[in-house]
Regions:
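Conserved AdoMet/S-adenosylmethionine-binding subsite of the radical SAM
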Residues: 52-64, 73-204, 210
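Short, charged low-complexity linear segments at domain edges
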Residues: 1-14
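A C-terminal junction/extension of Radical SAM enzymes
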Residues: 213-235
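Glycine-rich, highly charged phosphate/nucleotide-binding loops
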Residues: 44-54
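Canonical Radical SAM [4Fe-4S] cluster-binding loop centered on the CxxxCxxC motif
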Residues: 11-46
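Conserved beta-strand termini and adjacent loop/short-helix elements that scaffold enzyme active sites
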Residues: 3, 190-192, 231-235
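Conserved strand-to-loop "acid loop" that flanks and positions the catalytic carboxylate
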Residues: 70
């Protein structure tokens, strides 16, 4: 687990303290946090007491706590930790996830103010990300997460896609991905940056320009009849 004491960009409209969880059930070729793929020895973990104590120290300076990864949903104990943070401090909590563990999301949702889901591509290409699940199971899990998030009104919902051209190569694929995005979500297209990418292929790959991404977002809004589709510009 890692820690960024103060973040102005990770939790929209909040000054947040950010904790990273190591370990991930995917191996996205474009990932810039590949150092978090594997779980480190337990002696390197941040303790629950440290996290609670650190948040308490920062309450005068922050108005949010964010948990990212790696993949947060691999840690069932995060549910009780987030519950304690919410009940003890009354502060807003956000998590990032890939949405492949809907049962975890169902349990943690009551304590969240914000959830961000990374939808990578269409389910048939999740094998390219090192996902061991068959396409049908990926579909089922992403749809279950979508339905959970559509039914609740407790947390703001963000979906986002890193626009790696090999995995999102057409409007058709992008619009198919919309089937797995809740109606109440804001959806961001994020520019793929080859620097520090995990795979050699991704390091050498071209990126979409910001102009191309803006056109894609505009076309996706037109085709899907959704208006909350944007390009994230601070990357």
């Amino acid at each position: 687990t890692g820690h960024v004491q103060t973040s102005l960009v990770d939790f929209p409209e909040k000054i947040a303290t950010l904790f990273f969880f190591s370990g991930c059930n995917l191996r996205c070729p474009y990932c810039h946090n590949a150092s978090l793929f594997e779980v480190p020895p337990q002696e390197k973990w941040l303790s629950r007491d440290y996290i609670i104590s650190d948040i308490q120290k920062r309450l005068k300076f922050i108005d949010g706590v964010s948990f990212s990864g790696g993949e947060t949903s691999l840690y069932e104990e995060l549910i009780d930790l987030v519950k304690e943070i919410k009940e003890r401090f009354g502060i807003d909590v956000k998590i990032d996830s890939n949405g492949l563990k809907p049962k975890f999301i169902e349990k943690i949702l009551p304590y969240l103010s914000y959830i961000a889901i990374d939808i990578k591509t269409t389910p048939d290409l999740y094998g390219e990300l090192g996902c061991k699940l068959p396409k049908k199971e990926v579909e089922q899990k992403l749809l279950a997460t979508k339905e959970l998030l559509e039914k609740q009104a407790n947390a703001k919902v963000e979906y986002r896609t890193t626009m790696y051209p090999k995995l999102v190569e057409s409007y058709e694929r992008l619009c198919k991905m919309a089937d797995f995005i809740p109606e109440n979500a804001v959806y961001y297209l994020q520019r793929f940056i080859c620097d520090n990418a995990y795979s050699a292929e991704a390091k050498a790959a071209d990126s979409y320009s910001m102009e191309q991404l803006e056109r894609m977002a505009m076309e996706m809004r037109r085709i899907t009849k959704r208006d909350k589709i944007f390009v994230r510009t601070y990357l």
